[in-house]
Amino acid sequence: MLIKRSFSLSRHRTSVALEPEFWAVLDSEAEKAGKSLAAVVAEIDRKRGLRPLASALRLHALAAAARGT
């Protein structure tokens, strides 16, 4: 099951659908960094290049999980 969340990125709204496990890692990372989830997503968005946002978020979450964060 995918969970869809919406964010404002670069002055426009976008929605991203990810599995709950990926959202849990991203939520945890944001909390530990003292940032909002939207701020973390915006940082990933700025660094993703041509990669689709959902893919960039999944890869970021996998890397965070591998680091144990």
Task: Label the predicted regions.
Residues 3-4, 45-47:
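Short, solvent-exposed loop/turn elements at beta->coil junctions and helix N-caps
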Residues 13, 17, 36, 52, ...:
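Amphipathic alpha-helical recognition patches that constitute DNA-binding helices
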Residues 21-46:
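Surface-exposed, Lys/Arg-rich phosphate-binding patches that contact polyanionic backbones
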